[in-house]
């Protein structure tokens, strides 16, 4: 039951009505028996500064940040973590010492399955990343953290690819990072130990689309990991095609759950988060069980 003592968490975005975050966070809060509630806050870009001041005034403990605010919120925060600085985006904000502090848990979300269920020695391995937008930044940083020998980012716009590459110039990641246009994929796919889709191609409602065709995936190594950040539909065409070549498939639902787990650890200041409950709540909500 919500009372005057209930502590507030939430997610800000525009739109935010379809966010899955309240489903999994409230399931975890209920399982833990805590007097918290996690709410969606639809906030238009023009209202962002006023909105986060208001969230402070009403005592919000912390909040998630989604599109289109992940970059725009940075100058409005008192402090951001080195991880958020490197990625250039914030997805988790916490109230500390009467100030807003931002970080990014997308890296933790992305690498979690690669450190647990699918753990291997990545130091001699090659990662190929499709897309060079905001999501790709977290994936690049995650691959570097895992120790990949080579990280290849593939995009369609030469100018944006160069901007992406130069944005890492002051980071040790630059040594491992190469960028390529889409026509180079025929050479990269056979080398890939990890192939990640960070593009929206294949996301609902365009469920019949894939960033790569069956022919382009034909030379993917058996046992390579295909990882799609999309979680609706499940599985995507990209993952279905990769599995037909003998690849191991990971979808975006696990990343969503694990970045949420990392955020709850920060807000609740405890390590014991019921990840299975969060995963099951999402699967049930999406009609996957």
Swiss-Prot record:
Enzyme type, top EC level: oxidoreductase
Location of the active site: 70
GO biological process, one term: chorismate biosynthetic process
Pfam families for the chain: SDH_C, Shikimate_dh_N
Annotated positions binding shikimate: 19-21, 66, 91, 106, 231
Keywords, ordered alphabetically: Amino-acid biosynthesis, Aromatic amino acid biosynthesis, NADP, Oxidoreductase
GO cellular component entries: cytosol
Binding site for NADP(+): 131-135, 229, 252
Catalytic activity of the protein: shikimate + NADP(+) = 3-dehydroshikimate + NADPH + H(+)
Subunit structure as annotated in this protein's UniProt entry: Homodimer.
Function description: Involved in the biosynthesis of the chorismate, which leads to the biosynthesis of aromatic amino acids. Catalyzes the reversible NADPH linked reduction of 3-dehydroshikimate (DHSA) to yield shikimate (SA).
Family of the protein in this entry: Belongs to the shikimate dehydrogenase family.
Cited NCBIfam families: aroE, PRK00258.2-2
Protein name (record): Shikimate dehydrogenase (NADP(+))
Native species: Trichormus variabilis (strain ATCC 29413 / PCC 7937)
Lineage: Bacteria, Bacillati, Cyanobacteriota, Cyanophyceae, Nostocales
């Amino acid at each position: 039951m919500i009372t005057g003592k209930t502590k507030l968490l939430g997610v800000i975005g525009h739109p935010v009505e379809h966010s899955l975050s309240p489903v999994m966070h409230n399931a975890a809060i209920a399982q833990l028996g805590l007097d918290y509630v996690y709410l969606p806050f639809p906030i238009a870009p023009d209202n962002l500064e006023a909105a986060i001041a208001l969230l402070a005034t009403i005592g919000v403990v912390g909040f998630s940040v989604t599109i289109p605010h992940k970059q725009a919120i940075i100058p409005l925060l008192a402090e951001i973590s080195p991880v958020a600085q490197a990625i250039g985006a914030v997805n988790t904000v916490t109230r500390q010492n009467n100030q807003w502090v931002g970080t990014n848990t997308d890296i933790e979300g992305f690498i979690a399955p690669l450190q647990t269920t699918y753990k291997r020695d990545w130091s001699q391995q090659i990662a190929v990343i499709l897309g060079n937008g905001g999501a790709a930044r977290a994936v690049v940083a995650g691959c570097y953290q895992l120790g990949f020998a080579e990280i290849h980012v593939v995009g369609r716009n030469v100018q944006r690819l160069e901007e992406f590459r130069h944005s890492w110039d002051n980071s040790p990641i630059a040594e491992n990072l190469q960028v390529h246009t889409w026509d180079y994929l025929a050479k990269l796919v056979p080398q890939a130990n990890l192939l990640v889709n960070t593009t929206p191609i294949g996301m609902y409602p365009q469920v019949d689309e894939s960033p790569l065709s069956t022919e382009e995936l034909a030379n993917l190594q058996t046992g390579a990991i295909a990882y799609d950040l999309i979680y609706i539909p499940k599985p995507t065409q990209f993952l279905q095609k990769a599995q037909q070549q003998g690849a191991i498939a990971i979808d975006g639902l696990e990343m969503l759950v694990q970045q949420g787990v990392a955020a709850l650890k920060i807000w609740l200041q405890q390590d014991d988060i019921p990840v299975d409950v969060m995963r099951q709540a999402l699967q049930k909500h999406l009609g996957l069980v």
